[in-house]
């Protein structure tokens, strides 16, 4: 038996030398010697016929051979796998001197950029940012704002009604009147950005959904000069410090007096063009009363900005639909950092 074990040891190492460069052959060798019906298994079965004294010696030699085969095969497999990996890495070697690939960096949507610009301005002036429901009751969307049932001004804001008492808000003024009630007659300075909805036919300049940002100030001794200065700050922030504005009378049921604000554009021939950008006015006394303010003690002003209109004028865009088509060719023009976007 000892001679047989010695011969098997020689046989294993001879086969190993022939097949150690092939992983599949090593697996076959493993199965041949260590498998369930392999050479060592059959050798172990032969122990049963040996005398007790020889059985112990032969069993020990078989275990030594088994451990030698296991460790040797494991070592050769690791060497072979490591060599294969190194060869693969050499084939896929990276040249660190090559220039890196440029990739597109995301940026805020142009409408959000304008909202953030306005928000930063008003936060620096001590205003708070308030947001609210896009589905609103008729009471807060119209009645609290001096537009009772049947008021003709409701026709100015064709609405999407969900049921007789609920609709998609037509402005963010619903946020303002709720905040006024929450303050219980105290002063406030807020802006309220968000999406609003009106039953308009979609075309180059109209959309049934658009972005709006409204502002509201309530305090003692507020007058029209405060409103005018605020409007100048807005236009200078958005269009430059030299930008002129033109104020003209208008009508809104929730402000009195009410005005429209136009940008004054001087053409090359010296003539002037007026582009409407927002509406504003002093808060109507009835709106103050509705929110439990005493109009004899408190006054206020409000303004509403259509974000898409500002963006279209600022960036000379001729179709509002561009903001909502998600065309990366359009949007990347407004990326704040275009360093890595040149070849996208």
UniProtKB/Swiss-Prot annotation:
<keyword id="KW-0067">ATP-binding</keyword>
<comment type="similarity">
    <text>Belongs to the class-II aminoacyl-tRNA synthetase family. Phe-tRNA synthetase alpha subunit type 1 subfamily.</text>
</comment>
<comment type="subunit">
    <text>Tetramer of two alpha and two beta subunits.</text>
</comment>
<dbReference type="GO" id="GO:0006432">
    <property type="term" value="P:phenylalanyl-tRNA aminoacylation"/>
</dbReference>
<dbReference type="GO" id="GO:0005524">
    <property type="term" value="F:ATP binding"/>
</dbReference>
<dbReference type="InterPro" id="IPR022911">
    <property type="entry name" value="Phe_tRNA_ligase_alpha1_bac"/>
</dbReference>
<dbReference type="InterPro" id="IPR045864">
    <property type="entry name" value="aa-tRNA-synth_II/BPL/LPL"/>
</dbReference>
<keyword id="KW-0460">Magnesium</keyword>
<dbReference type="GO" id="GO:0000049">
    <property type="term" value="F:tRNA binding"/>
</dbReference>
<dbReference type="InterPro" id="IPR004529">
    <property type="entry name" value="Phe-tRNA-synth_IIc_asu"/>
</dbReference>
<dbReference type="GO" id="GO:0000287">
    <property type="term" value="F:magnesium ion binding"/>
</dbReference>
<dbReference type="GO" id="GO:0004826">
    <property type="term" value="F:phenylalanine-tRNA ligase activity"/>
</dbReference>
<dbReference type="GO" id="GO:0005737">
    <property type="term" value="C:cytoplasm"/>
</dbReference>
<dbReference type="Pfam" id="PF02912">
    <property type="entry name" value="Phe_tRNA-synt_N"/>
</dbReference>
<keyword id="KW-0648">Protein biosynthesis</keyword>
<protein>
    <recommendedName>
        <fullName>Phenylalanine--tRNA ligase alpha subunit</fullName>
        <ecNumber>6.1.1.20</ecNumber>
    </recommendedName>
</protein>
<feature type="binding site">
    <location>
        <position position="256"/>
    </location>
    <ligand>
        <name>Mg(2+)</name>
    </ligand>
</feature>
<dbReference type="InterPro" id="IPR004188">
    <property type="entry name" value="Phe-tRNA_ligase_II_N"/>
</dbReference>
<keyword id="KW-0030">Aminoacyl-tRNA synthetase</keyword>
<keyword id="KW-0547">Nucleotide-binding</keyword>
<keyword id="KW-0479">Metal-binding</keyword>
<dbReference type="InterPro" id="IPR006195">
    <property type="entry name" value="aa-tRNA-synth_II"/>
</dbReference>
<dbReference type="InterPro" id="IPR002319">
    <property type="entry name" value="Phenylalanyl-tRNA_Synthase"/>
</dbReference>
<dbReference type="Pfam" id="PF01409">
    <property type="entry name" value="tRNA-synt_2d"/>
</dbReference>
<keyword id="KW-0963">Cytoplasm</keyword>
<keyword id="KW-0436">Ligase</keyword>
<dbReference type="InterPro" id="IPR010978">
    <property type="entry name" value="tRNA-bd_arm"/>
</dbReference>
């Amino acid at each position: 038996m000892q001679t047989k074990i010695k011969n098997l040891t020689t046989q294993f190492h001879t086969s190993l030398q022939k097949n150690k460069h092939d992983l599949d052959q090593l697996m076959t060798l493993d199965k041949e010697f260590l498998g369930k019906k392999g050479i060592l298994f059959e050798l172990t079965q032969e122990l049963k016929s040996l005398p007790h004294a020889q059985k112990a010696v032969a069993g020990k030699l078989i275990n030594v051979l088994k451990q030698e085969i296991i460790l040797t095969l494991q070592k050769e497999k690791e060497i072979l796998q490591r060599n294969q990996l190194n060869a693969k890495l050499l084939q896929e070697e990276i040249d660190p001197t090559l220039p890196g690939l440029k990739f597109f960096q995301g940026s805020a949507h142009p409408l959000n950029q304008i909202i953030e610009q306005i928000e930063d301005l008003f936060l620096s002036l001590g205003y708070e940012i308030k947001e609210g429901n896009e589905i609103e009751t008729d009471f807060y969307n119209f009645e609290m704002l001096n537009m009772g049932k049947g008021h003709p001004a409701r026709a100015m804001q064709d609405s999407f009604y969900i049921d007789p008492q609920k609709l998609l808000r037509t402005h963010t003024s619903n946020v303002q009147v709720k905040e006024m009630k929450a303050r219980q007659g105290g002063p406030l300075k807020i802006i309220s950005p968000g999406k609003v909805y009106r039953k308009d036919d979609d075309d180059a300049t109209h959309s049934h959904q658009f972005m709006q940002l409204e502002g509201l100030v309530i305090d003692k001794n507020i007058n029209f000069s405060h409103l005018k200065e605020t409007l100048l700050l807005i236009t200078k922030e958005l269009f430059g410090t030299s930008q002129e504005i033109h104020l003209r009378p208008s009508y809104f049921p929730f402000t009195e007096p009410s005005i429209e604000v136009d940008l004054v554009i001087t053409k090359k021939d010296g003539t002037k063009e007026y582009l409407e950008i927002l509406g504003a006015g002093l808060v109507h006394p009835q709106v103050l009363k509705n929110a439990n303010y005493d109009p004899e003690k408190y006054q206020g002003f409000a303004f509403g900005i259509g974000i898409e209109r500002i963006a279209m004028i600022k960036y000379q865009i001729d179709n509002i639909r561009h903001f909502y088509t998600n065309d990366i060719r359009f949007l990347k023009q407004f990326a704040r950092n275009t360093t890595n976007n040149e070849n996208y």
